[in-house]
Amino acid sequence: MPVDLDNSSTVSGEASVSISSTGNQNPLPNSTGKKKRNLPGMPDPESEVIALSPKTLLATNRFVCEICNKGFQRDQNLQLHRRGHNLPWKLRQKSNKEVKKKVYVCPEVSCVHHDPSRALGDLTGIKKHFCRKHGEKKWKCDKCSKKYAVQSDWKAHSKICGTKEYKCDCGTLFSRRDSFITHRAFCDALAEENARSHHSQSKKQNPEILTRKNPVPNPVPAPVDTESAKIKSSSTLTIKQSESPKTPPEIVQEAPKPTSLNVVTSNGVFAGLFESSSASPSIYTTSSSSKSLFASSSSIEPISLGLSTSHGSSFLGSNRFHAQPAMSATALLQKAAQMGAASSGGSLLHGLGIVSSTSTSIDAIVPHGLGLGLPCGGESSSGLKELMMGNSSVFGPKQTTLDFLGLGRAVGNGNGPSNGLSTLVGGGTGIDMATTFGSGEFSGKDISRRKS
């Protein structure tokens, strides 16, 4: 019995020595100066290098109890377990000679830590290194399906998985924000590069897209020659006019914007004097087969002398044209006076340069005096000339109050001068003069009818 006590005391003494020796292996760092920590895999050159096989490293229970077959990772734990079975147990004691520090190398030949100069100084560290880098990943996370080769890593991940995470568009999960930002920048750059390559490929495969975006402009049509256009339109109108039996050949002339002068009478004094054509307002025909009524030089501004009746018929015999290009009023009257004086016909139409192609006389077309009761015989044209020059006896001292020209003055009362038709036409263009013949000397019965 006392032997047992001595044995127990001896065992306790060995345990104390072992604990003290292990405590001396990790001395406290000096407070005065920090000791630089050795980099991983850079052990002390004097350390003992130990190479273990993969089976030994992966073994969970290296030390097994022979009574209950319970395994332990450390021999010290097994010795303490033996005390429960009342078996002899022995703890390592500190020897007098110094024990060298042990380092462990990785059993994988291709690993950098297989070199003794890069050996790891901890048995647990070398085990975890071998499992992480070269072992099988046995533990899997239930939330993110991530696998781990070390059980401790799996447990640490399971505690924080799903609590705070950053998910990229590509599906990768990150628990740290800095890692997520770095990955996101790389992922965005990669996506942009892929988009550019895809766009370039689509352009090569579909060249029609470029033609749709940049259509070829239509060629500008060549300018049309105005002279040829005039000739073509003139020939067309000539053909159209030739189809009508009443319309003689025409002379086409373009003129500036005309100004109309309308004289309204009660019975159509000059209605039917000219025949209207179906051409545009700038193109017209006359009753003469050789020359136009209003043919003049381009330097004279044209004017249209439109004398219309109260029934709405125009001077040219059509309501479709309200203005016809012609000479100015002053030039028209001067020409009429000159040609009327030199002509033997003595009519207004002959004075204006209109010569009928038929044998019908001027008296048959327009009655004597133009229906105004004026002497206009074939012997002389003094009556009409006087009317045109303003010296006719119509404006003489006759007892009538008829406002013949609609100018607000009494004609024939002798109170003021009158200039006749020359004053009327020479006064300007665009004037409508209403002449009322219902009473007095000039009755509507004296006005001749239009040509049948």
From Swiss-Prot:
> Has the keyword Transcription been applied to this entry?
yes
Q: This protein is called what?
A: Zinc finger protein GAI-ASSOCIATED FACTOR 1
Zinc-finger ranges (C2H2-type)? 63-85, 104-134, 139-162
InterPro entries registered for this protein in UniProt: C2CH-3rd_BIRD-IDD, C2CH-4th_BIRD-IDD, C2H2-2nd_BIRD-IDD, IDD1-16, Znf_C2H2_sf, Znf_C2H2_type
- What compartments host this protein? Nucleus
The source organism is Arabidopsis thaliana
**How would you summarize where this protein is expressed among tissues?**
Observed in vegetative tissues. Mainly expressed in hypocotyls, petioles, shoot apices, root tips, and trichomes, and, at low levels, in leaves, stems and flowers.
Q: Recall the taxonomic lineage recorded for the source organism.
A: Eukaryota, Viridiplantae, Streptophyta, Embryophyta, Tracheophyta
Region Disordered, as annotated, extends over 1-47, 196-254
- Give the protein's biological function: Transcription factor that acts as a positive regulator of gibberellin (GA) action, homeostasis and signaling. GA converts the GAF1 complex from transcriptional activator to repressor via the degradation of DELLA proteins.
Q: Name one GO molecular function term.
A: DNA binding
Task: Note the superkingdom of the native organism.
Answer: Eukaryota
Per UniProt, what is the name of the gene that codes for the protein in this document?
GAF1
